[in-house]
Amino acid sequence: MSLVSKRIRFALRLLAAGLLSASASAELRPLDDGELSAVAGQGLINLDALTYGGYEYTRLNIGGDMKLLTNIDKLRLGNFARTGSSNPSNLGTVSNQAADIAIDNFALGRVDNAGSANAQIVPFEIRDPYIELAFKNNGNGVREIAGVRLGFGRARGDLSGDIHSLTGTMEGYINGPASIALEYYKQTHSGCDFNCIALSIAGDAELYSKVQLVKEGSGDVTQNGVPINRATQIGVANGDRFHTTDAFLDGLLPLLATQGGDCKASGLPACFPLLNYKSIFVGDRLNSNLATGGAQGIFFSVQGQNVPWQDLADKSKFIQTQAGAFANFAKYTDGNKDIYPFAVALYDALRGTARVDTCIGGKGC
């Protein structure tokens, strides 16, 4: 609970500082009835209250857009020892990382032509950010803070960092021609075995799959019956498989491209270190309209117990989080279509992605 309290105090201090600076630069004056009747819109800041599953929630919504270029040397959330059976979620720990979320050189946004006089900042865009508190009565009937989260209505842009561990939901989409997979297979294997022949037959048919946080070596997404935490890899989960747009080949792929608990599919790696991906693009890279191209439902939370948070991408659902820290980059549904918060080309999935520039020339960050 002390960890939660520290995060909450920091968030409230930051919010108070922003409000004070805003009020100091604005002149307040009364409006007469005529002026009021000409005004339409909603408040910049509003509060929502919700009760669910024995929890009470208060959410402070900040209506508006933000553009960020941010660099943080070390981001650590949920930095505590996960030992003992008092917290059942400890049974899901799959690495020796010291924090639930551990990212070095964390950055939002990028800089194009960073080393030239024509350097251009391409910010990370956020719409309708919010801070939310969850409350619950303890055994003595005292109302306590159970958790706090920071989230966004929409988000779009480059996220960079050396990701050592993640806890939560990280769902993405990889796709690319089978010929890319065949080329990689030939570079990493001698001869042409059954997998090689199958990929050759597939030709340029598109392969695609969902990827998520997985346990290294097996691709499991649970351990001892609970969701994994402190994951160091992302990939095709144990039991999932690659699909293809070719109907005939898709019927054969379950025999060829299913991840069977060894982090391989069609002889190719199906689980990848998070450290391989120095930058990912959140949202739709091809749609620059934040209202339609921004990813929904993203949040970071810290809680002293397992807290269900409302999924703002689908308010009829709640996302179960473990005690500790949690990052939510989950897919959501728009009509009949699944939308993933990020997509990676098959070529990059196999080889990793380079970091985009996040500083301007010699000026530093």
Go through each PLM region and give its residues.
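Long, compositionally biased low-complexity segments
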Residues: 51-365
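Low-complexity repetitive segments in secreted/extracellular proteins
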Residues: 1-51
